[in-house]
């Protein structure tokens, strides 16, 4: 399946996998999805990820995290902010705080993909891709 918006496709696949309590989900690999997966791993939203396959057919396999006996997903909400039809940009001073700092905003900056906190520390703004909490 070919997706025009790979970020929305990635977020939807993660959201659907969490809804049915799957342990892993597969996502087509791009530089952007690999960078977002690294941010999710660094922030503790996913356990791990690995790239399987080669070339254009390569996939990222994300290992999702759950808590408790009922296996409640660590990721409760994934929201796409900047979309292909309406881009959302923010400077470093106006970057949003998601749920007062409990969640994260993933930002695409000139220094790479990072969280809103890292972007504030480095004093860079950019395109606000999504909110996660």
From Swiss-Prot:
GO CC list: ribonucleoprotein complex; ribosome
Keyword set includes RNA-binding: yes
Organism domain of life: Bacteria
GO BP annotations listed: translation
Keyword rRNA-binding on entry: yes
Gene3D superfamilies assigned: 3.30.1370.30, 3.30.1490.10
Annotated keywords: Ribonucleoprotein, Ribosomal protein, RNA-binding, rRNA-binding
Pfam families: Ribosomal_S8 (PF00410)
One Gene Ontology term of the molecular function aspect: structural constituent of ribosome
InterPro entries, sorted: Ribosomal_uS8, Ribosomal_uS8_CS, Ribosomal_uS8_sf
Biological role: One of the primary rRNA binding proteins, it binds directly to 16S rRNA central domain where it helps coordinate assembly of the platform of the 30S subunit.
Family: Belongs to the universal ribosomal protein uS8 family.
Summary of subunit composition and partner proteins: Part of the 30S ribosomal subunit. Contacts proteins S5 and S12.
PANTHER family, per database record: 40S RIBOSOMAL PROTEIN S15A
The protein's name in its UniProt record: Small ribosomal subunit protein uS8
Organism of origin: Microcystis aeruginosa (strain NIES-843 / IAM M-2473)
